[in-house]
């Protein structure tokens, strides 16, 4: 066994952290970074620097390296790839030994992989494109409190996407008027109504008043329709203690589901709330407020597919994913990729959808994908095609903006959805025949007919800022 000796000084990162012959272990956490290096910094050195700074390295040699097995604990940059169509940056693949990270702590994973290294001067920009979590790590995480099948069984809703609605205006309503808006939408045919992400406990509507009036609305709508209903009560709060206080009250008044802003509220708070929901039989809806600050820049930040994986590990039964056809960012191929990462047990590498690694989730339950943001009845055929059954299609303005009111807007959406589900069962192509399908349904539904007339010219056709960088789309 060679004797280790200490030599003070500064060495190139590539001497220790660039290892092109390394074969990743099944237990390694793998990362794909998009690196834009500073001028004069070669690719291998920049990749090795990222591997070092995101694992156990620092800028100089230290004598305490002799007290550990650095070769075991270090991150290893093992492969570089060009980014198709962009010669200013490249992909670097880095492997991290599983023992670098606390079991079941996505907080700890992020502290290393997207911590100080993102301010490192050797790189001009840095983006975490994807992560592969080994099954050995997945098994240490709590995951969704309940998952898709448990939620369907509890609500007795099968064979179709579920319908939701974010109450508008998002701010300013009194608690009683807010509850009334919920009731009208639920009795009209929706499965859920929802707090907007920035509704917490403001002077115009304190959280306890909102919870009480909303649950009165939910229970009344259930009695009238004979269907299970719910409202996503946002328990996001200034402190964890206050968050749990709100969650406990939601449980006391019979709420089947609560809501959390997992990025703004924090991953630590989210994991704790997911555990509470699992223990108390409450479903957990997750909003992604703040994600675009992190993921929209194609050269710097964290891709949303990573945030999707982190949420599934941290815990949530629903996650907002964008719509493709609505007002929010997200191209179709990428969105289909992260929808699968939310729901499937195993997702293979697929560069055409931006997935860089195989991801095995084992027996971890999946999450409902939530489509929300600028959608209306004309989008229904595309939404059913893109998102499939295990999704929640949320029409805020597309419900409450109906000329005849909330109940009519909800009814229009329900008729449109059921028409699309029936047409799909008949083997029809929804996106090609969508207009005919909706027009036929509208002949028997004046609510749908008016909705189609109201929003027939409304489209959100903007090119995505963050596009897939693949050789053959």
From Swiss-Prot:
Positions contributing to substrate binding: 116, 166, 170, 288, 320, 372
* Cofactor or coenzyme needed: Mg(2+)
**EC number(s) of the enzyme?**
4.1.1.39
Sites where N6-carboxylysine occurs are at 194
Q: Which GO terms describe its biological process?
A: reductive pentose-phosphate cycle
- Family assignment from sequence similarity: Belongs to the RuBisCO large chain family. Type I subfamily.
Subunit comment: Heterohexadecamer of 8 large chains and 8 small chains.
What is the recorded name of this protein?
Ribulose bisphosphate carboxylase large chain 3
């Amino acid at each position: 066994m060679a004797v280790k000796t200490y030599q003070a000084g500064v060495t190139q990162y590539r001497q220790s952290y660039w290892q092109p012959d390394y074969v990743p272990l099944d237990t390694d956490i793998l990362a794909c970074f998009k690196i834009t290096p500073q001028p004069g910094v070669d690719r291998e050195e920049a990749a090795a620097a990222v591997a070092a700074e995101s694992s156990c390295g620092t800028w100089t040699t230290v004598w305490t390296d002799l007290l550990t097995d650095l070769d075991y604990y270090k991150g290893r940059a093992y492969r570089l790839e060009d980014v198709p169509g962009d010669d200013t940056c490249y992909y670097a693949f880095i492997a991290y030994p599983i023992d670098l990270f606390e079991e079941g702590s996505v907080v700890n994973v992020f502290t290393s992989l997207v911590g100080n290294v993102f301010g490192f001067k050797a790189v001009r920009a840095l983006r975490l494109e994807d992560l592969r979590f080994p099954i050995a790590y997945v098994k240490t995480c709590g995951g969704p409190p309940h998952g898709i099948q448990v939620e369907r069984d509890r609500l007795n809703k099968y064979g179709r996407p579920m319908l939701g609605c974010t109450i508008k205006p998002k701010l300013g309503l009194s608690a009683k008027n807010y509850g009334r808006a919920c009731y009208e939408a639920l009795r009209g045919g929706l499965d859920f109504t929802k707090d907007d992400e920035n509704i917490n406990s403001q002077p115009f509507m304190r959280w306890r008043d909102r919870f009480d009036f909303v649950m009165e609305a939910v229970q009344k709508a259930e009695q009238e329709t004979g269907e299970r209903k719910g409202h996503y009560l946002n328990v996001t709060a200034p402190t964890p203690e206050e968050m749990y206080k709100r969650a406990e009250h939601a449980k006391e008044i019979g709420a089947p589901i609560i809501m959390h802003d997992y990025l703004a509220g924090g991953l630590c708070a989210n994991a704790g709330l997911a555990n509470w929901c699992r223990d108390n039989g409450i479903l957990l809806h997750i909003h992604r407020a703040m994600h675009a600050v992190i993921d929209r820049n194609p050269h710097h930040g964290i891709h949303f597919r990573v945030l999707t994986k982190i949420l599934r590990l941290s815990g949530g039964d629903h996650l907002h994913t964008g719509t493709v056809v609505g007002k929010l960012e997200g191209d179709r191929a990428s969105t289909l990729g992260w929808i699968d990462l939310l729901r499937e047990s195993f997702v293979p590498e697929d560069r055409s959808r931006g997935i860089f690694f195989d991801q095995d989730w084992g027996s971890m339950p999946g999450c409902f994908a939530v489509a929300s943001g600028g959608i209306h009845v004309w989008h229904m055929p595309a939404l059913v095609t893109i998102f499939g059954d295990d999704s929640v299609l949320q029409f805020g303005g597309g419900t409450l903006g109906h000329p005849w009111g909330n109940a009519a807007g909800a009814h229009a959406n329900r008729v449109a959805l059921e028409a699309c589900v029936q047409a799909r069962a008949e083997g029809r192509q929804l996106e090609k025949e969508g207009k005919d399908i909706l027009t036929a349904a509208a002949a028997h539904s004046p609510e749908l007919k008016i909705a189609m007339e109201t929003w027939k010219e409304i489209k959100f056709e903007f090119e995505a800022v963050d596009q897939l960088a693949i050789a053959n789309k």
